[in-house]
Structure formats: C-alpha cells, structure tokens
C-alpha cells in the first residue's frame, strides 16, 4: 500500500513538473528513444576509430590542444569541411586573426558559406558564440583559440597590469551558459587550445592548457595532438607524421591513440591512413614494397598506393567501410539489420529465379523434333 502511495506521489510530482516546465523536462530514462550518437568525421579514419563512435560527437564540447604547428587547426578545418559536405552550417570564431582562406579551401572548406567572426576581445567572442549556438541553426562552431580570448580589461589596461584569473572566470561563465544550448541544438563546439609550462613542477608533466579548469570539465572529448616525425621526399620536408591521443572521452573508452600523415598544402592524408589501417587489419596486403587489395595491385611504395586510392575514391570508400565494419565503428545496428534483410531478400529472389530457370519448358522446336523422332520409330 505504501508503495502505491509513493508511486502516486511521484506521478503527481512528474505531472506538475511537466505542467510548469514543459513536456520533456523530466522523464523516465527508458522512455527516451535510444538513437545512435551523431558524429562529424575528423578526416582521419584512424582518429574516427580511436574516438570509438566514428568521429566528433554532435552536441558536445571538444577540446583540441598541442604544441605549436602540431596540426590543431588543420584537424579542425577537416572537421569543418566534413560538416559542410554533410549539408551543415559552420561558424569559425577566429580570435587569433590568423585563418588562411586559401589553405582552408585546399582542405575542402566551402569558404563562401563559412560564417567567420574575428572579435576584438574575449567577451565579444563568447557572446557571439552564445548567440550563434542559441539560434539552433549551426552544426559546428570553432573557437581558435582559447589563449587568444583576451578579456576586455586586459586589452584596455596597461601592459604591465596583473589580471589573475580573468580569462578562467570568463571561460567558466561562458561554458555554463552554452553547454545546455549545444546539447539541445546538436551543435558541436571545438575549442582549440595552446600549451603552457607550469613553473616549479618537479614530478609529472609541467604542461598545462590555458583558460583554467572549466574547459577540462565541460569537454566531452579532449584530444592531445603531437608531431612525431617529419616526412621527407629526398631531402625536402613534405609533411609530418602526427599522433593524436584521446585524453578524455565521455562517449567511448578513452586513452586510445591514432597516427596519420599531414602533408603540407594538402592536410590529412586520408588515403595514407587507409593504407596503414588496411595493412594492420588484413584488408591490404604488403609484399616487399608492393601493396595489393583483393589481388589488385595498388602500387609500389606507399606514395604510389596513396595516389592510386586518391584516383579511385570508390575503392578507398570500400576499404574504409570494411575497416569500420570489422571494428564495429560507425555502423548503426538498425542499418546493419536492414542491410542483412535486404541481402536475404536478394538471395531469396536469386534462388527463386534459379528454380524458375530449372522448370522452364523446352523450346517448341526441340519438342517438335522429339515428336517427329518418336513417330519415325513407331
């Protein structure tokens, strides 16, 4: 009896909350539709797989940080290009005033439709971010970078003035405001951040990111990007080998790593990453310097194989799909079931056609000949 009274009291409270705050303000978790996490591809298959869900999750805060010239902006511009290719609207808040439109265009960004803001101070930048996110019309917004979000008081003050904690308070307030709006509008916010050294650290890493601790807490995904090797063509440097570590991940297991090539003037080499992943998972075979896929030669040396895949995008898509299917990343269960059902139906149709072919009567001419032969014998 007591249990029934408690259930009635709970139902009454839930009904009152819905009347006061609107439908969906509170619900039983089982009543929610379990939709797969929507993502934006990073441009690197290896990194999409390391993230566990096939890309950067929609409606979340993402932080990308690393040393100078490590590929932070390049990685972000690839995400911008992929969001636009999927029909999304993207905004870029260039607090550093350093975005190169020509380079962005080379990476596939539609600069004609990219919403760009170059604010004067940190308050203005984050106010613009808040207004754009609350419009509900964006799929992705990029802030480059947190370190360049200089508070108004610091800009208007003297050069030697101390402004301890101003930027951290600004970031904390902004993230409190926009996090809910990001989730409701399914907008991904990428904050690019820089590294600083903590003075007097004896043990552990002395590196830290700018903007206080708020971003560390509010970010669903944190990516640490580092340049690990210089790629050379003879004596000329043509790119960097880059490693990204998923330091924090609220949508999949963290601490996974991905490596890929960033080529100067071209960005992330998707085809090079597919070759590496294909060899690792047994889809692409390497014998000496030759790379082959299902008996077909891709080329001698990684560069030739990379160019072959670039010239044959359908083949590259096929290899990527097989890798993701094997690892169970980016494959929706309902889509997999639908595909299996379609395959089964196609197999049934084929079998029916074969049976029908077997029971087709002999042509009339042959039947006539057989009748004549029987008559002659008799």
Swiss-Prot record:
One of its GO terms (biological process) is DNA recombination. ATP binds at residues 66-73. It is found in: Cytoplasm. Its main location: cytoplasm. Keywords: ATP-binding, Cytoplasm, DNA damage, DNA recombination, DNA repair, DNA-binding, Nucleotide-binding, SOS response. Gene3D superfamilies: P-loop containing nucleotide triphosphate hydrolases. HAMAP family: RecA. Belongs to the RecA family. PANTHER family: MITOCHONDRIAL DNA REPAIR PROTEIN RECA HOMOLOG-RELATED, RECA. This is Protein RecA.
